A protein has these predicted regions:
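Feature captures the catalytic ectodomains and active-site-proximal regions of enzymes
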Residues: 1-435
Length: 435
């Protein structure tokens, strides 16, 4: 609550360009957005408490929007074809998390949680208009203003244009042992929850943040040289909403009304709207209100996007990298990978080898653990193994009715992935030494 009530917006008066307004939002006002979101999560059902807080927030937001739309003509989205450009110039071992609805304040929280352990580069992207999923995911994956409704088609186009063998998966499916050189991970939980539960989803957002923190950490520990976090759009929250708060979609001619934007055939002259010329089916223009409030529509109110406020348009373009370690660690590897392509029988051995050439006193031993995966699921693991310089150890595991296994060797303390092996079960029968 203190962040909201003690916020000082005086520096907004010195913002005389669009870029300075953007900087004011990312450096200062995004904290207010986070504060009101947390207050909604705690008090949304207690109108006597939340309404005065919401009204104060809206007064601050009104000041911001006045400046935002004053310099809005300088706005130019840089979202079109972003992933194409990124992967064309990318080197192997790059992972990109493409979120749906990751507002800037969420990404800022994630970055603050990780910057103590990793190198964080915080850049911003300006989302396209209208700031909705189909339109802006197409902008990221395809570019040139082309909109592809089916996500698999966007992925196929990105692979074709970038010329890279990109692996696509849902973020939740990530597991140690994945070895793709170029990886795109989809994370749609924020937008899915928002669309389904509206403001009821607010209480879940902190869990989504923890998932992203955990997965970015895991990717870097798996050996990815850089992990990027981007999204299609942000969102606004309407809070306590009365019928009188909703905006009338008074457009002339044929129109298509959404909660945060309107498509029209004819050009409109409403000074309370911001519009651009954009063809979409039979429509020629798209308009959004110069406000965070929704149009009267068939949509569900609470969580929404599609408009052109800073909360919807200013989005993260963050990257994360590991700092070089100040001290060396004992190198431990799986030494029998070549012998594991065709294993006869229901059991297999994993042999570990610790480097014998180390001269660093602090690298004389290392605690490791072996994890066993089948179909992306962790089915078994070893106890913690302490490896000393030059030492060898062997651990036996069962296939557990699986034909193929991925073995992952982890550092116990850092959870860094040290080595990976693929183990395949042979179709030949184990004759127990009878031959």
């Amino acid at each position: 609550m203190n962040t909201l009530m003690e916020f000082n917006s005086s520096s907004l008066t010195t913002c005389h360009t669009f870029d300075k307004v953007v900087a004011f939002y990312t450096e200062h006002f995004s904290k207010v957005d986070r504060a009101i979101r947390n207050l909604y999560a705690a008090f949304l059902q207690e109108k006597a408490i939340i309404r005065p807080l919401q009204e104060y927030y809206e007064s601050l937001n009104y000041e911001l929007l006045q400046k935002w739309f004053e310099y809005r003509p300088e706005y130019q989205s840089d979202q079109q074809g972003y992933l194409i450009s990124l992967f064309k110039n990318a080197k192997p071992r790059i992972a990109v998390i493409v979120g749906d609805g990751i507002r800037y304040e969420i990404s800022e929280y994630i970055a603050q949680a990780l910057e103590k352990k990793f190198k964080v580069d915080k850049q911003i992207m300006l989302a396209d208009m209208p700031s909705e999923t189909e339109h802006n995911m197409s902008a990221l994956y395809v570019g040139n203003g082309e909109v592809l409704p089916v996500h698999k088609d966007r992925e196929k186009r990105l692979t074709e244009i970038s010329g890279k063998a990109i692996t696509y998966m849902d973020l939740e499916a990530l597991s140690y042992g994945d070895t793709a050189d170029y990886l795109v991970l989809n994370y749609g939980d924020i937008d899915k929850a928002g669309e389904k539960l509206q403001q009821g989803a607010i209480k879940l957002f902190s869990e989504f943040e923890l998932v992203l923190i955990d997965k970015i950490t895991q990717l870097l520990n798996m050996g990815y040289q850089e992990v990027h976090l981007i999204t299609d759009h942000g969102f606004v929250l309407t809070g306590v909403l009365d019928e009188a708060d909703k905006l009338s979609p008074d457009a002339t001619g044929t129109k298509e009304v959404h909660e945060r934007f309107i498509r029209t055939i004819d050009k409109q002259s409403n000074s309370a709207w911001f519009g651009v010329k954009e063809s979409h089916g039979e429509y020629n223009y798209v308009y959004a209100a110069k406000s965070h409030r929704p149009f009267k529509s068939k949509g569900c109110y609470g969580y929404s996007h599609g408009g052109v406020t800073p909360q919807e348009i200013i989005i993260p373009k963050f990257s994360f990298r590991k700092e070089k370690a100040a001290t060396s660690e004992l190198e431990v590897t799986i030494s029998n990978k070549k012998e594991s392509n065709e294993v006869i029988g229901d059991y297999f051995d994993i042999k570990l080898q610790a480097d014998s050439k180390t001269t660093d006193l602090f690298a004389s031993q290392r605690k490791v653990q072996i994890l066993i995966y089948a179909g992306g699921v962790n089915i078994s693991s070893s106890s913690i193994i302490t490896m000393k310089s030059g030492e060898r150890q062997s651990v036996e595991f069962s296939f557990q009715d699986n034909l193929e296994i991925i073995v992952v060797l982890l550092d116990v303390e850092t959870r860094e992935q040290l080595d990976v092996a693929n183990i395949k079960k042979s179709n030949a029968r184990d004759l127990g030494g009878l031959l």
